[in-house]
A protein has these predicted regions:
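Short, flexible, solvent-exposed loop/turn segments with mixed acidic/basic and small polar residues
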Residues: 39, 270-277
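ATP-binding N-lobe of GHMP and related small-molecule kinases
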Residues: 1-94, 104-115, 312-315, 320-322
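Short, basic and Ser/Thr-rich N-terminal targeting/leader segments
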Residues: 9-11, 32-34, 76, 128-130, ...
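Gly/Ser/Thr-rich beta-alpha loop segments that engage phosphate groups in nucleotides
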Residues: 18, 30, 93, 97, ...
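A structural signal for isolated positions on well-ordered beta-strands in alpha/beta enzyme cores
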Residues: 79-81, 284, 308
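ATP-dependent small-molecule kinase catalytic core of the GHMP/sugar-kinase superfamily
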Residues: 2-6, 16, 22-26, 115-272, ...
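N-terminal pre-core extensions flanking Radical SAM catalytic domains
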Residues: 276-288
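Glycine/serine-rich anion-binding loops at beta->alpha junctions
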Residues: 83-108, 129-137, 274-278
Length: 322
């Protein structure tokens, strides 16, 4: 094929894992923003360009994916351009969405359609612990995965996929970073740092059972029946319970005093569906209508943080050919 391939995908809010050992499992929701956009087109030789901050990390990520997709002595003959990427290390699953978009863009630009999904996932090299963002890349929606106790495949199966009620919205609160990119009172957790933390933790079979019950008996039915308050209460409790699995390595159910204090402030103000997405520092709260979410954004934006209104995605990534 010839011409430009353009992949657009969103982000994911992770409500928490079921356990700290395989098959892990968990749930979350895909959102429309922050958006990631990757383009690729045939070229005489492989190259990657970016128009977005963080170009070194993005360039290295793209080249690693190209190496997995290339032959022993050459990379795919495509030009990859990262047009837009969600901010990294905020708990929004940006690495998974970017990696999958890069891999799919390279495959489509070099080989044409259709793309073998297993090859795409292998090239992106994601889903080691959580498969929410990987499944959600293709489907959108609320995702629950890894609910079986004996799964041994590399990527957990998709157990539940639901559309969120159309009026519901979430607001993501992200602390503003200093000039070094750090967030006060919050440790960035990824890569080898993340692995080291998991290595310190022991499986928690009883807690897994409790969290699985909340997920299947409370969160899923509340989404299906559009019961907003029941959904919010269950998500808050599930998120805290999942966070307590990591208390030994993050100082409590949430990662750092800043996140802990913000969640307490939100709950004391009476908000619903409040929690930390993944390792944070992104914090979410859910709202029954767009208007209530917008009012919250106006009230809670301040010099220390940004408030972003997001809509649940009802479909997976989009692919365009020019």
């Amino acid at each position: 094929m010839s011409g430009l391939v353009r992949i657009s995908t969103g982000a994911r809010l992770h409500f928490g894992l079921l356990d700290v050992a395989a098959p892990f499992g968990g749930c979350g929701v895909m959102t429309d923003r922050p958006e990631t956009i990757v383009e690729a087109k045939p070229a005489a030789a492989y190259r990657c360009a970016t128009t977005h901050a963080g170009s070194t990390d993005h360039w290295q990520r793209a080249e690693a994916i190209a190496q997995r997709l290339g032959s022993q002595d050459s990379l795919p003959k495509v030009e990859v351009r990262i047009v837009q990427a969600a901010p990294s290390h905020n708990g929004l699953g940006s690495g998974t969405q970017l990696s999958l978009a890069i891999a799919e863009a390279i495959l489509l630009a070099s080989n044409g359609s259709p793309v073998d999904r297993e090859r795409l996932i292998a090239a992106a090299d994601r889903g080691l612990r959580s498969a929410v963002g990987t499944h959600g890349y293709f489907t959108g929606g609320f995702i629950a995965e890894g609910l079986g106790d004996d799964e041994n495949q590399k990527l957990n199966r998709l157990d539940e996929r639901l559309d969120m009620p159309s009026p519901w919205r979430a607001v993501v609160l992200l602390p503003k970073r200093d000039k070094t990119g750090a967030v006060e009172d919050s440790e960035t957790v990824s890569g080898s740092v993340e692995q080291a933390k998991f290595d310190q933790l022991a499986p928690a079979a009883q807690r897994r059972g409790e969290l699985k019950r909340v997920l299947l008996d409370e969160i899923v039915p509340a989404i299906r029946t559009h019961q907003f308050e029941a959904f919010g209460e269950a998500v808050t409790r599930y998120n805290r319970g999942g966070g307590e699995l990591f208390a030994a390595v993050q100082g409590g159910p949430y990662n750092g005093t800043g996140t802990t204090d913000l969640i307490a402030e939100l709950l004391n103000a009476g908000h619903h569906g409040v929690g930390q997405s993944s390792w944070g520092p992104g914090v979410f709260a859910w709202f029954p209508t767009p208007k209530s979410a917008w009012c919250f954004c106006d009230a809670w934006n301040d010099p220390a943080r940004n408030a972003y209104l997001v809509s649940p995605k009802r479909s997976g990534r989009t692919v365009q050919f020019d």
